[in-house]
């Protein structure tokens, strides 16, 4: 750690080089996933029957049956025994048009080549040709390249892949052609004879340049909704979307002024922006300098946006499943939702952390007088006290509804409960949004669209292979109540993180916080009430509330989908949901949530011993242990451990086996860091085991 430097150019070069290393790790990881798909998976069998065969790409090898661990290889259908996977890669590969393991091998090797290139680039751009600081601060060129090249050309390339490879292959697969009879992509992508089978591909680019775009409407569609055969978005709709996105981003990448004297100048934009209403001082003046000299500030904004985007992706993945047969693979749907929600939560907490680090290390009050940031900091008391009031209001009222319901149900007075069958609290605004979205197709808002974006808004159930792919999601009193719990927990998380940022440099209690740094345990001895007040401690506390918030979110999602959406569709069209619609009545009380969700659904993981799911039973216990271990760090005082260590050192000295280095107890901050890490690891792994054992056993 002696190599730490505050030289901005050197820091920028190190970060830039590390990015290439990070990309190399990602390519190696992806290569491993594709190699497993090619070598150890049942992908080709799944491709021939994605309804009754489950995805598997891991087979536990028997170790002379000493342990008997091959019990974990469950029957996933088609005579294949292995561990059921829930990554969604099989569905993605089918959407890509991959039909042979050789294509997966080629991609895996290609990813390793790319990893090697990235490692070389990381070395080259640090040791041989490191960019100058001016290059890192040239934001207009950066925006143009990221928008036009990365997002624009990236989307254009994916649109091209969808049109030339995915659409023909998926058309054949949907028509029942065996994957073995479909040629490799490399054999037909340039074969005019093959393309002639799909007449729309043979019209060339002439209609494009003559603006006669309508002739492409058979593979660039506006159908809307889901494909009833695969339960996913229409691939032709996706191709249309990606092409449109590509055009928009390529245009967007020409907006900023570089070598030619046209386009926006980012500094002029920010300096000139005063806001829509009233007098807000100097507006955004000074923000350009902040964002080009503080990578913490830049990172904080990017993390907040990317984290929010990840949570939005989580919702789109189930409402508008993008890949064929993804919607009927319930374990994968639950895993993808949970994964994207948690990733989003961690990134948003990271945004709070780096914003606070910026405030302490990079913020210069003298350069920010009466601008937007200065004005926010100066009325931070009003912001935080209002946010605190909102949290108190939401907490007491939302939790109070549950307390009321538990009390009434306990006393045998169901007619006095808040429920759909007694005192109704209908989410009328959410229901209004649903009805607007359900009716949007063909209306003035979307005249050319054939159907609403998804059946979730209201509409017919889409059944694939006797399973519900997607159906309307009814909202009622139970949803209204838990949504206010979501509002409460999210607002508390925001309160903690924002307070950490706005009071990072000073507060009435500790005026010299900026001198003490990002992480300090307490403001010295003899100064009560100043522990857990540093910016780092706000991140520490924010992590717990983030975990708390998102646990309720994923529990809500898991139970709601099992209750009201996922299930079996019978030949007469009737639907039997997994938990037979019990969410609306049971989720109204705390007791109901414990009894009918946590306890009832934990039966799968608790009773998993002796089955292929038994590893989840072991994981469930081990993760509980890790979680409980964290409490030892979170509840302890440092003095206890130091005193214990000193008595142990005394015993070693008596036996003349004392080490030369005197051991020390963890610092308060270290103890908290170890505590929160194990708390989150234990909690997440417990939930992982609970969810997967449940949904694999019933899904």
UniProtKB/Swiss-Prot annotation:
Origin: domain of life:
Bacteria
Q: Which parts of the sequence bind [4Fe-4S] cluster?
A: 522, 531
InterPro entries annotated for this entry? PSI_PsaA (IPR006243), PSI_PsaA/B (IPR001280), PSI_PsaA/B_CS (IPR020586), PSI_PsaA/B_sf (IPR036408)
Task: Decide whether keyword Membrane is in the record.
Answer: yes
**Residues the entry annotates as binding chlorophyll a':** 624
SUPFAM superfamilies in the record = Photosystem I subunits PsaA/PsaB
Q: Where are the transmembrane segments?
A: 15-38, 104-127, 143-167, 238-256, 295-318, 334-360, 382-404, 480-498, 538-559, 613-635, 673-693
Q: Which residues bind chlorophyll a?
A: 632, 640
Q: Which GO terms describe its molecular function?
A: 4 iron, 4 sulfur cluster binding; chlorophyll binding; metal ion binding; oxidoreductase activity
The subcellular location is: Cellular thylakoid membrane
A GO CC term assigned to this protein in UniProt: photosystem I
Subunit record text? The PsaA/B heterodimer binds the P700 chlorophyll special pair and subsequent electron acceptors. PSI consists of a core antenna complex that captures photons, and an electron transfer chain that converts photonic excitation into a charge separation. The cyanobacterial PSI reaction center is composed of one copy each of PsaA,B,C,D,E,F,I,J,K,L,M and X, and forms trimeric complexes.
Q: What does this protein do?
A: PsaA and PsaB bind P700, the primary electron donor of photosystem I (PSI), as well as the electron acceptors A0, A1 and FX. PSI is a plastocyanin/cytochrome c6-ferredoxin oxidoreductase, converting photonic excitation into a charge separation, which transfers an electron from the donor P700 chlorophyll pair to the spectroscopically characterized acceptors A0, A1, FX, FA and FB in turn. Oxidized P700 is reduced on the lumenal side of the thylakoid membrane by plastocyanin or cytochrome c6.
In its UniProt entry, what is this protein called?
Photosystem I P700 chlorophyll a apoprotein A1
Q: Gene name on record?
A: psaA
